[in-house]
């Protein structure tokens, strides 16, 4: 198997596994904390940091990847999701709103690191040749087109796991599965993928036009 295809399959497999857990953790948190008697407003607050830190990560993720490589940002995102899932396996008495918001913040950072890394790496691994553009289009379509389907499957998976094995075992099981997936990805992905020869300064990620920045 050619190196580019092998790398693409590793990236896609890791991205799919992550997306499943991303959908599942949302459904598990909503249903579990609803069952615990949390109000709709409290449940909404559980996801506040997930969105806020995801937006921040989306803004600086490319700059980070240019310095350390897409392979490292993807692996970091995967293992950060493992930590977030593991953090939610603690004793129920620990699961305050602030605690869960912190865990979901880690998940939000992980999600955008993983998404950015997966999508950006595809262009780098497509073999050069006559049909390179066609193959790039197909590979990107497979990777990105699967997102909503897999996230929906993750919602179903989360509800099923909550019903069958409960909240803590569901979180622990997904953490273990994702750990194995990203451990393999860490071994399989080429080092330094996507690093830039010229390191941009942090301030260069902002536009010179003030109106765009604000």
Which stretches of residues belong to each language-model region?
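Juxtamembrane intracellular "pre-TM" segments in multi-pass secondary transporters
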Residues: 1-5, 186-214
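Hydrophobic core of transmembrane alpha-helices in multi-pass small-molecule transporters
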Residues: 16, 84, 95-114
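C-terminal ends and interior cores of transmembrane alpha-helices
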Residues: 79-94
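Symmetry-related core transmembrane helices of the 12-TM Major Facilitator Superfamily/SLC fold
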Residues: 169-187
